[in-house]
Curated annotation (Swiss-Prot):
The gene is pheS. It comes from the Bacteria. Tetramer of two alpha and two beta subunits. It catalyses: tRNA(Phe) + L-phenylalanine + ATP = L-phenylalanyl-tRNA(Phe) + AMP + diphosphate + H(+). One of its GO terms (molecular function) is magnesium ion binding. GO terms for cellular component: cytoplasm. This is Phenylalanine--tRNA ligase alpha subunit. Coiled coil: none annotated. It is found in: Cytoplasm. It comes from Mycobacterium bovis (strain ATCC BAA-935 / AF2122/97).
């Protein structure tokens, strides 16, 4: 087994078997047969132990050369078969980019977003403009400029989220009314704007309250505006959101930033076949002190404002019993409203 002829025969047999292996499984069996522990080349290495010491070195070189030759043939064939396998996998798993894609079911847009966009479209069609403001506000814009007294309950921590440190006079806005002040300070008169955004109050999340809610607020400041203009705007808004038969009424109320002030109710046919008056929001003529705070002469200009919660509007308009459904992110809640309604 240690003769050059025997080693050459073993190497030739191994290389021939390796060359004929056409799969990785066959090649693995060939390796076991010709390079494994009981292969002729392995037995030749074991036979070195019984040779005389003076012959062992030369015979060892021949055995190692023979095994290395067989191993190189195996490694080359292994690389070739692996490359062929990988190429076949790429072809089998290839993607035809010209094929039409598999349709993914469309998700549902949140009904609050759809309602906000519909409100915006309604007022833009009336010639109004959209206005925005920051959610982190100062007491100056959220309370002071809106004629809130220093001891007004709304300023308390039981109603308002304040930003640390205590003397920063910053808070999460409790209404979108600060946008009124920022707009009047930044724009030329007349002003007709609608602002829609998130507001924050320290309410517990329950069936009718949420600490984060969306509010729509309208402001008009021009020469000669009156409560009649306010009523006409509210009626048009109500018909756009509740249908052509909807109508509004106002009841005296108090807000620091309007005088006179009123709460507005809306009458409409609801989703369960009935009709009734429902409290909708607040409104009134802009208080002269608010106009003065923005450098506007109340003897020359007047204005009106109104504000409604979108969650509440959606809740009683669509007969939603629990406001928590609007914030839990369950797509099953959004789907009945339609993808793009």
């Amino acid at each position: 087994m240690l003769s050059p002829e025997a080693l050459t025969t073993a190497v030739d047999a191994a290389q021939q078997a390796i060359a004929l292996a056409d799969t990785l499984d066959v090649l693995a069996r060939v390796k076991t047969e010709h390079l494994g522990d009981r292969s002729p080349l392995a037995l030749a290495r074991q036979a070195l132990a019984v040779l005389p010491k003076e012959q062992r070195a030369e015979a060892g070189k021949r055995v190692n050369a023979a095994r290395n030759a067989a191993q190189r043939s195996y490694d080359e064939r292994l690389a070739t078969l692996r490359a062929e396998r990988d190429a076949a996998v790429l072809v089998a798993e290839g993607i035809d980019v010209t094929l039409p894609s598999t349709r993914v079911p469309a998700g549902a847009r949140h009904p609050i977003i759809m309602l906000a966009e519909h409100v915006a479209d309604t007022f833009i069609a009336m010639g109004w403009e959209l206005a925005e403001g920051p959610e982190v506000e100062t007491e100056q814009f959220n309370f002071d400029a809106l004629n809130f007294p220093a001891d007004h309950p709304a300023r308390g921590e039981q109603d308002t989220f304040y930003i640390a440190p205590e003397d920063s006079r910053q808070l999460l806005r409790t209404h979108t009314s600060p946008v009124q002040i920022r707009t009047l300070l930044a724009r030329e008169l007349p002003v007709y704007i609608i602002s829609i955004g998130r507001t924050f109050r320290t309410d517990e999340l329950d069936a009718t309250h949420t600490p984060i809610f969306h509010q729509v607020e309208g402001l008009a400041v021009d020469r000669g505006l009156s409560m009649a203009h306010l009523r006409g705007t509210l009626d048009a808004f109500a018909r756009a959101e509740f249908g052509p038969s909807a109508r509004t009424r106002i009841r005296p109320h108090f807000f620091p930033f309007t005088e006179p002030s009123a709460e507005v109710d809306v009458w409409f046919a609801n989703k369960i076949g009935g009709a009734d008056w429902v409290e909708w929001g607040g409104c009134g003529m802009v208080h002269p002190n608010v106009l003065r705070a923005t450098g506007i002469d109340p003897d020359l200009y007047s204005g009106f404002a109104f504000g409604m919660g979108l969650e509440r509007t959606l809740q009683f308009r669509n007969g939603i019993p629990d406001m928590r459904d609007m914030v839990e992110g369950d797509v099953r809640f959004s789907l009945p409203f339609g993808v793009g309604a």
